[in-house]
Each structure stands twice: as structure tokens, then as C-alpha cells.
Amino acid sequence: MTKFPRWLAMLVGLLFPLSALTQQQGLTIDIVGGNTAATPIAVLPMPYHDSAGAPATDVSGVVAADLNRSGQFRTLPLGQITERPTHGSEIRFPTWQALKQDYIVVGRVLDARQGTYRVEYELFDVRNGKRMLGLAMTARASAMRDVAHQMADAIYEKITGLRGAFFTRIAYVTASGSHGAMRYALMVADSDGYNPQTIVRSAEPLLSPDWSSDGKKLAYVSFEKGGSSIYIQDIATGSRELVSSFRGINAAPSFAPDGHRIALSLSRSGNPEIYVMDLVSKQLIQLTNSFGIDTEPVWSSDGKFIYFTSDRGGRPQIYKVASVGGAATRVTFQGNYNASASVSYDDKKIVVAQGSGNVYRIAMMDQSSGSTVWNTLSTGSLDESPSFAPNASMVLYAAREGGRGVLYAVSADARVRQRLVSVDSDVREPAWGPYRSVH
């Protein structure tokens, strides 16, 4: 389970950078757990009002799926929708009160000419009939899923007060083929697994993708220099830069919030230690110097601290050090194995891969209340590589099921889990990207 031997065992690989080549097969989502206490909301079908060709995307279906998988909402099944208003003025609120719905979303899709569509939608509080949102968005047919994700974000934020994270992307690595003929790919997709793009193909494993804060670049580990090397690649253009190929291990890159630095693990002086590299000058600052293995750095939201995994105390635990250097302090104390930290946007929550015996699960350390509370989020036996959504409402992680790799997204309260599966490959090494800008 531990990632330390993985770095030491990697062989020389060959990478073939691609410019965001679309891959046909995406991820499919199965919801394997639900939250009966979630807020009930009716997202009504949004019909197309024009004689021209309708967009292929079911906008209301995407919105409903987003809200469902958040764990905060429970949408009314289509079979129970007895009335189908498309404007707020057509809503008969007693109908939805009888169906025990707290909120209702209505809307319609219009032809905006020149190959674009306009989606108009409204959100209402069923209890008092008050309109909470009334918005419209225009986009081309190819961008209608983006529109739906942004609609779900707006609805989520209006009701919960927390920014939605549906209009985001995830990165992950796929592995296919048989021993001796394995093929790997670094992928980027929408947060629900749709619209996959191949960023890099490889004949050897790819590791540790990490997003820049603007979502335009990925850092990752490759092996084309006779050992591990770290590259940074532009997602849109496919251009990439070799930033670290020192003798020994070059591992676990992590972008600073300012986008101008990365933290990484290097063994150039012996044991793997944590360093910070300025991406312009390539100057290095060594932050740790211990007899153990220090790896998997991740930044605090303000860039002042770096959390990392170290076995300096005998077993892997999470430690913290100032990003300009200084003494490291231990952060995790529950359990004998805590690794692969991901830190929430407010630095109050940390998710880790937590081991007990031969069982490894995703656990969250929550200090929001001022005291430390632990909660186990996953149910597998070989769960790893947790990654917070940018609003910390969900966690993406890798698991093994039936001898193959899959991804799971779990709500932060552990009440809702979805499995993301590739039909023809293993999936591993997930990383949830930052918020995307809305144009």
C-alpha cells in the first residue's frame, strides 16, 4: 500500500506527450450509497422550445445527477413527477408540498441561433413559494454539459452557502493490457467522468498528477531519463517542461497556491527529503533532513506550510513544516499508518490513507470545531490516494475491487459514495482539480 517502495521499484519508461487527444472511453458512475437525510429537491425536465435540432445533452438530467452525488440533495425520481411546469408562474406549490419537496427547479432550453442554445432556469423554495434564483446561460451544443454543471453549482451554493464543485475536472491514470505489454495514460475528465482527454501515454507507469492552481497545467512523474523525472505539462497545448531529473528519486510534485513553486521529494542527498523549487530559477530549498523517508508534500491553502508523509518515527505519519524551512511537527496521531494527505481549502480538514493491519481506508481528520475528530470515509481494504474537491464537500480516492483499480467519490460525511469505473482499464492516481473560470 505504501508509496515508498513504488518509487524505488520503477523502471525506465517512455512517454509520448499528446495535445489533449480525446479518448473515446470515459468513466461510468454507479451510486453505491445514498443519504436518506439529504435535502429533497425536484429538478424538472427542461424541454427544448424550438423547431430546430435540440441539443443532445439532457441538461436537467445532468443537474439532477450532480446534486444527487453531492450527498447533500436527494432529487425526486422522474416517475414521481406528476406536473411539468417550465416557468415559475406555472408551479402549483401544493403539489410539491404534498410530495415533500423542499425545493423545485424549472426551466427550458431555447434556440439562440448560430449554433447556440439558451437555458433559462429558476429555483424556488417550495414551503413559501419564494424564487431564489432566476438565471439564463447561453452556449454551443458541445458546452451544454458545462452549462448544466454551472447550473448545479449555482443551485448548490444558493441553498447550502458553499460554492459548488461540479464544474471542475479530475485527473487520473489508466492502465490497460497484460504483463509485458501494459499501457498507461494520464487522463483529464469532467468531475463526473465525462469528456475524457488523454494528456500523456506511456509504456511504463505514470504517477502523482497534480494540478496548478489555475487548472491549466499538470505536474506528474515519468521515467524517460533513466530514472524518475518530474514534468509540468500544459493541458491545452500539450507542451511540457522537464523540471526535475536529479540522480535518485524525483517524486510527488505539488504546486504551490501561487503557481510559481512546486514542492517535491528528492533523494539527491541520500534519503528522500522535501524540497521547494522555484519554477523560474529552478532554485531548490531543502525543507527536511531526517533519517526516514519524507515524501508526498501538499501545500496549505495560504502557501505558508507543507504537509508531508514521513516514517521518521518508525511508521508513516503526516507532518507539517513551514514552506520557508524550519522544524517539522507531527500532525496525525491516531493509528499506526497515515499517508497521502490532502488538505481542505480552509486547512481545517485533512484526508489520508489510514492503515490498520492489512486494511487501508480513507479517513478524515476534522478540526473545524476546534477539537480533532476522525471519521472513516471508505469501506474497502486497499483504498489510497485521497483528493479533496475544491470545496471539500467530497473526496476522490483510488480502490481495488476484484483485482482491478477503480475510483470512488465519497461525500465528506461518508453518506454517499459513487464508483467511477473504466470499462477497459484500471483507474488510479486521482487528483481533483481546482475551480474552473466561467467565461
UniProtKB/Swiss-Prot annotation:
Top-rank lineage group of the source organism: Bacteria
Q: Which GO terms describe its cellular component?
A: periplasmic space
Transmembrane portions of the chain: none
Keyword Plastid belongs to the record: no
Any one GO biological process: cell division
Signal peptide range = 1-22
What Pfam families does the record tag this protein with? PD40, TolB_N
Q: Does the entry feature the keyword Cytoplasm, yes or no?
A: no
* Location within or outside the cell: Periplasm
Q: Which UniProt keywords apply?
A: Cell cycle, Cell division, Periplasm, Signal
Which InterPro entries does this UniProt record tie to the protein? Answer: 6-blade_b-propeller_TolB-like, PD40, Tol-Pal_TolB, TolB_N
Summary of the function given for this chain in its UniProt record: Part of the Tol-Pal system, which plays a role in outer membrane invagination during cell division and is important for maintaining outer membrane integrity.
Subunit structure as annotated in this protein's UniProt entry: The Tol-Pal system is composed of five core proteins: the inner membrane proteins TolA, TolQ and TolR, the periplasmic protein TolB and the outer membrane protein Pal. They form a network linking the inner and outer membranes and the peptidoglycan layer.
What HAMAP family does the entry give? Answer: TolB (MF_00671)
Query: What PANTHER family does this protein's entry cite?
Result: PROTEIN TOLB, PROTEIN TOLB HOMOLOG
Q: To which protein family does this belong?
A: Belongs to the TolB family.
Which protein is depicted?
Tol-Pal system protein TolB
As recorded in Swiss-Prot or TrEMBL, the protein's gene is named: tolB
